[in-house]
């Protein structure tokens, strides 16, 4: 699917509990923030996020709920024709991870078999509650997972690169230049990053629990 300018363009549905940092995350991409459009009928902001790859440009039209999820579920119109998705939770609030299966169920009901990335946001906050070893939902449902920190730009591009590779069917796709991002509001401690990356590696090798105690 191309935009009018020939750039491959995909609808990306961004979901997760209110307050997990979805809007903060999408606003990091400065041109997308500048060019966003408001869809009044659905009460949604659509941010066109363009990335430069070794195969040319790719655009994600990221649909952001503008906080409607605080009032219950989202209308089907939000999901319809979604081609990929990011489910976000807050690693400092366990309840937001507990609700991930509900968001996944809503997505899967309307958008069958689309590539989905699960993101644990706010890993810059020292008091992390949802640890790597308890994050197993993505392994059960064949999703990709990334720790992210919207406010520090940590791993900002990772979900988009993984989705771009899936959507374009090219596992060797690379981003050749980073988009202009808002300056970091916080700095990630390199030692903490190294520790979290090691924790995720170890968690990926661990056996999955038989039950759903992690949810």
Curated annotation (Swiss-Prot):
Its main location: nucleus. It is found in: Nucleus; Chromosome, Centromere, Kinetochore; Chromosome. Residues 6-170 form the Small GTPase Ran-type domain. The lineage of its organism: Eukaryota, Metazoa, Ecdysozoa, Nematoda, Chromadorea. The gene is ran-1. GO terms for molecular function: GTP binding; GTPase activity. Residues 36-44 are annotated as: Switch-I. Belongs to the small GTPase superfamily. Ran family. Keywords: Cell cycle, Cell division, Centromere, Chromosome, GTP-binding, Kinetochore, Mitosis, Nucleotide-binding, Nucleus, Protein transport, Transport. It comes from Caenorhabditis elegans. PANTHER family: GTP-BINDING NUCLEAR PROTEIN RAN, RAN GTPASE. One of its GO terms (cellular component) is nucleus. This is GTP-binding nuclear protein ran-1. GTP binds at residues 17-24, 67, 121-124, 149-151. It holds the Pfam family Ras.
